[in-house]
Amino acid sequence: MGRIKTYDFDGEYVTWTTRWSYAGSIYYRNGKFSASSNCGILKVLNKEINPKFLAYALKKEAKKFVNTTSAIPILRTQKVVEIPIDFPPLQIQEKIATILDTFTELSAELSAELSAELSAELSAELRERKKQYAFYRDYLLNLKNWKEENKYYKLGEIAQKVLVGGEKPADFSKEKNEVYKYPILSNNSKAEEFLVYSKTFRVEEKSITVSARGTIGAVFYRDFAYLPAVSLICFVPKEEFDIRFLFHALRAIKFKKQGSATGQLTVAQFKEYGIHVPSLKKQKEIAAILDPLYSFFTDLNEGIPAEIELRKKQLDYYQNFLFNWVQNQKAASIL
């Protein structure tokens, strides 16, 4: 978000992001502002509707109306005007908006304080754990420290198969169920980020995924069936290699961007990277040492986001409670 000297709007408005990954994000505005082409704008003309209440109500519902089947997620104006909302009397709207303002402010303060406090306390510990893991990993993977024979392999020689993900299928579900039970893994740096689920899978064996674009070289171990999304390389090794050893070995590789301005890692380039591999017994010994160190590092690394997510869930709970109360009041009046 930037700033300019002029403005196009002045007053109370509700805006939403129309496209890309934040499509359906709702904002309450009060003051002077301008808007980009990816911003939808709604002005409340009915004096019996509180704009801030409307913003909170849309925050709860808008994401359900985002079109995620296209290549670019989008929430069009035609869809926004179709979103059904129950409006209690104006006085109740104002009270609900005030309550949610308080919860939102408190949640933001708690998250900021929590993040700052935990970051200050844990950042040194996190850096130390990361250094410990990297030190032992690099030491154990260094062939100079091995007393037994080893062999140099290109990743293409180790692989039983290597494939790259494709476009997200048109038929998917945002919720996991008996039909849509295979997560679609995106190309990102997080170990688990299941946005949607598919009926089918492309990889069912234990595998290693490597981000091929964006956060190039983010390496994760997968022990479940899944459908990879575009720019995610999936590596399934042959049985004579220990996959946990390979997971740590691939994390030590500095994968480089190739090609276009944005840069990406192709399957052909991936296969050309190489590592030294000892006997299967030695591979398992090294993995047995590095696995707990890696868990020791990642458990701490995930603690802060988990706590902040808990705060968000608390806010969502109270927001849903209030809007469900509004709907129940409407149903009671009809009966």
Curated annotation (Swiss-Prot):
Gene Ontology terms for molecular function: DNA binding
Keyword hit for Acetylation: no
Keyword DNA-binding: yes
Domain of life: Bacteria
InterPro entries attached to this UniProt entry: Restrct_endonuc_typeI_TRD, Restrct_endonuc_typeI_TRD_sf, Type-I_RE_S_subunit
Keyword annotations: DNA-binding, Restriction system
Pfam annotation, one family: Methylase_S
Alphabetical list of CDD domains matching this protein: RMtype1_S_Fco49512ORF2615P-TRD2-CR2_like
Free-text domain note: Contains two DNA recognition domains, each specifying recognition of one of the two defined components of the target sequence.
Function: The specificity (S) subunit of a type I methyltransferase (MTase); this subunit dictates DNA sequence specificity. The single R subunit has multiple frameshifts and is probably not expressed.
Assigned protein family: Belongs to the type-I restriction system S methylase family.
Oligomeric and partner information: The methyltransferase is composed of M and S polypeptides.
Protein name as catalogued: Putative type I specificity subunit S.MpnORF89P
Organism (species): Mycoplasma pneumoniae (strain ATCC 29342 / M129 / Subtype 1) (Mycoplasmoides pneumoniae)
